Curated annotation (Swiss-Prot):
<dbReference type="Pfam" id="PF02033">
    <property type="entry name" value="RBFA"/>
</dbReference>
<comment type="subunit">
    <text>Monomer. Binds 30S ribosomal subunits, but not 50S ribosomal subunits or 70S ribosomes.</text>
</comment>
<dbReference type="InterPro" id="IPR000238">
    <property type="entry name" value="RbfA"/>
</dbReference>
<protein>
    <recommendedName>
        <fullName>Ribosome-binding factor A</fullName>
    </recommendedName>
</protein>
<dbReference type="GO" id="GO:0043024">
    <property type="term" value="F:ribosomal small subunit binding"/>
</dbReference>
<dbReference type="InterPro" id="IPR020053">
    <property type="entry name" value="Ribosome-bd_factorA_CS"/>
</dbReference>
<dbReference type="InterPro" id="IPR015946">
    <property type="entry name" value="KH_dom-like_a/b"/>
</dbReference>
<comment type="function">
    <text>One of several proteins that assist in the late maturation steps of the functional core of the 30S ribosomal subunit. Associates with free 30S ribosomal subunits (but not with 30S subunits that are part of 70S ribosomes or polysomes). Required for efficient processing of 16S rRNA. May interact with the 5'-terminal helix region of 16S rRNA.</text>
</comment>
<keyword id="KW-0690">Ribosome biogenesis</keyword>
<comment type="similarity">
    <text>Belongs to the RbfA family.</text>
</comment>
<dbReference type="InterPro" id="IPR023799">
    <property type="entry name" value="RbfA_dom_sf"/>
</dbReference>
<keyword id="KW-0963">Cytoplasm</keyword>
<dbReference type="GO" id="GO:0005829">
    <property type="term" value="C:cytosol"/>
</dbReference>
<dbReference type="GO" id="GO:0030490">
    <property type="term" value="P:maturation of SSU-rRNA"/>
</dbReference>
Amino acid sequence: MYKNIKKFKLESFIAQEIGNLIVSGGIKDPRIHSFLTVVKVEFSKDLINAKVFMGSIKEGASLDNAVKALNNAKGFIQSQIIKRIKVRSTPKLLFVKDDSLSKSFYVNKLIEGLNTTREN
């Protein structure tokens, strides 16, 4: 039970810190834009590896390039996280593209289109 609580807190903290780094412009790469968002973070059972699922709230934004840039900058990101958290070892980050946000925007547009046709 304690490990599950610790895992959940770490996942939340990592997501928040990565989001803060992106929004504040702490990562100096033009491929990383402020429309990126951390969808979720999943740790392995041993808390050594973490998958960070990234999405974009802007349509047409190049999520593939942004994920590549984040994977290139993961050493820097890990070093920034370790400054703010007290753990024995820094989790190894792997950034992964998550299309769920863009799919949900698409579904919302479809629903809005249906509502517009019903009103007319």
